[in-house]
Amino acid sequence: MKITNVEMVISAVKQEQYPAGQLPEFALAGRSNVGKSSFINKMINRKNFARTSSKPGKTQTLNFYRINDAFYFVDVPGYGFAKVSKTEREAWGKMIETYFTTREQLKAALLIVDLRHPPTKDDVMMYEFLKHYNIPTLVIATKADKIPRGKWQQHAKVAKETLRLISDDELIIFSAETGQGKDEAWGALQKWM
């Protein structure tokens, strides 16, 4: 996909702050520091558009990025980060649940997992949450450049089995370093646009 125009529209905490209009939205969910911002940057060919951080738990808002005035990537705060308080975790849970369960513009979730390791309990819970609410899900197994190509399928199989991936949902092996899986990801998103 040719990207002509990207704009960070709003960092939202409450429903009233979500952008108006009917453009399709794709929400990126995943553990803190799994590479959601790097995924966005690679997909839109920008170096540091979605700010990446080496501090886990940095994104505490829903960040809406408008792409080509055609759709949004919504960067969801990462989960599974121990250093936030119980109150913050509950507020996070409420914010995420509200977005995923009420937002009509949400077309699909992109669950970002680390291909190097089996999905965590939090990843499994997130996937089950998405399936409970019948949200179409594309699993992006990132950091593929960090393991030998010959082991990709083996790692992908573990990820699919751990998540108990249903046949409607696809897993794409991805690398923000090399661009591996980028065209495949655009192809998969296209069907919801």
Swiss-Prot record:
<dbReference type="InterPro" id="IPR030393">
    <property type="entry name" value="G_ENGB_dom"/>
</dbReference>
<keyword id="KW-0479">Metal-binding</keyword>
<dbReference type="GO" id="GO:0005525">
    <property type="term" value="F:GTP binding"/>
</dbReference>
<dbReference type="InterPro" id="IPR027417">
    <property type="entry name" value="P-loop_NTPase"/>
</dbReference>
<feature type="binding site">
    <location>
        <begin position="57"/>
        <end position="61"/>
    </location>
    <ligand>
        <name>GTP</name>
    </ligand>
</feature>
<protein>
    <recommendedName>
        <fullName>Probable GTP-binding protein EngB</fullName>
    </recommendedName>
</protein>
<dbReference type="InterPro" id="IPR019987">
    <property type="entry name" value="GTP-bd_ribosome_bio_YsxC"/>
</dbReference>
<feature type="binding site">
    <location>
        <position position="59"/>
    </location>
    <ligand>
        <name>Mg(2+)</name>
    </ligand>
</feature>
<dbReference type="InterPro" id="IPR006073">
    <property type="entry name" value="GTP-bd"/>
</dbReference>
<keyword id="KW-0547">Nucleotide-binding</keyword>
<feature type="binding site">
    <location>
        <begin position="142"/>
        <end position="145"/>
    </location>
    <ligand>
        <name>GTP</name>
    </ligand>
</feature>
<keyword id="KW-0460">Magnesium</keyword>
<feature type="binding site">
    <location>
        <position position="37"/>
    </location>
    <ligand>
        <name>Mg(2+)</name>
    </ligand>
</feature>
<keyword id="KW-0131">Cell cycle</keyword>
<dbReference type="Pfam" id="PF01926">
    <property type="entry name" value="MMR_HSR1"/>
</dbReference>
<comment type="function">
    <text>Necessary for normal cell division and for the maintenance of normal septation.</text>
</comment>
<feature type="domain" description="EngB-type G">
    <location>
        <begin position="22"/>
        <end position="193"/>
    </location>
</feature>
<keyword id="KW-0132">Cell division</keyword>
<dbReference type="GO" id="GO:0005829">
    <property type="term" value="C:cytosol"/>
</dbReference>
<dbReference type="GO" id="GO:0046872">
    <property type="term" value="F:metal ion binding"/>
</dbReference>
<feature type="binding site">
    <location>
        <begin position="174"/>
        <end position="176"/>
    </location>
    <ligand>
        <name>GTP</name>
    </ligand>
</feature>
<feature type="binding site">
    <location>
        <begin position="75"/>
        <end position="78"/>
    </location>
    <ligand>
        <name>GTP</name>
    </ligand>
</feature>
<comment type="similarity">
    <text>Belongs to the TRAFAC class TrmE-Era-EngA-EngB-Septin-like GTPase superfamily. EngB GTPase family.</text>
</comment>
<feature type="binding site">
    <location>
        <begin position="30"/>
        <end position="37"/>
    </location>
    <ligand>
        <name>GTP</name>
    </ligand>
</feature>
<keyword id="KW-0342">GTP-binding</keyword>
<keyword id="KW-0717">Septation</keyword>
<dbReference type="GO" id="GO:0000917">
    <property type="term" value="P:division septum assembly"/>
</dbReference>
